[in-house]
A protein has these predicted regions:
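Terminal, low-structured helical/coil segments at or just beyond the last alpha-helical repeat
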Residues: 30, 139-178
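Sec-dependent bacterial lipoprotein signal peptides
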Residues: 1-22
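Bacterial Sec signal peptide processing site at the extreme N-terminus
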Residues: 16-41
């Protein structure tokens, strides 16, 4: 008696087809849990200058200042996308202004754009002072982004605590004046 090879192949193939139908795609990572308004308030609070602290302020371009004021007004009205557009226009005029980059990072947080917020904050760190209130705001922005990530990055120097240590290192007392 001879057996056909088809049944021997058909049963494992059928079993594989059934198992494949049971598989599912991995679940999407959870959406970031971020209260943008609260995060921006915490960032701005971290940038408050003490009277005993060194705080350097650059000379401002009046056209850029007008756009920054427009963005501030739009943000207050809850029109975050329009505020971002005004800040982007200002950045076209002055792409290296660390304060402007920080304001753009904060605007990105308001629309829950974590990658954009971190990118603009890092640009501000690269192009700005490594001390003072603005430096603290850059690092607090990065801390807020890291805190809001659904899955924290497991790499040395990439934790919320690391960002907060960097933020605290930005505070330097002003030189004594005699």
């Amino acid at each position: 008696m001879t057996f056909s090879p088809i049944p021997r192949i058909a049963i494992p193939a059928l079993a594989l087809a059934v198992l494949a139908a049971c598989s599912s795609t991995p679940p999407a990572p959870p959406a970031p849990t971020l209260d943008g308004v609260a995060a921006v308030a915490a960032i701005r609070a971290s940038g408050g200058a003490a009277s005993t602290e060194l705080d350097v302020q650059p000379i401002r371009d009046p056209q850029v200042d007008d756009l920054r004021l427009d963005a501030e007004r739009l943000e207050t009205a809850g029109q975050y996308e329009q505020a971002i557009a005004a800040l982007d226009q200002a950045l076209q005029l002055n792409p290296d202004d660390p304060a402007l980059l920080q304001e753009r990072a904060e605007a990105a947080l308001l629309v829950k754009d974590l990658a954009g917020a971190e990118r603009f904050a890092r640009l501000g760190i690269e192009r700005g002072s490594k001390v003072g209130p603005l430096c603290r705001r850059h690092w607090e922005t990065i801390a807020q982004v890291r805190q809001a990530r659904p899955v924290p990055v497991e790499a040395p120097g990439e934790s919320v605590a690391d960002a907060r240590r960097e933020r605290d290192a930005c505070t330097i007392a002003a030189p004594a004046r005699y």
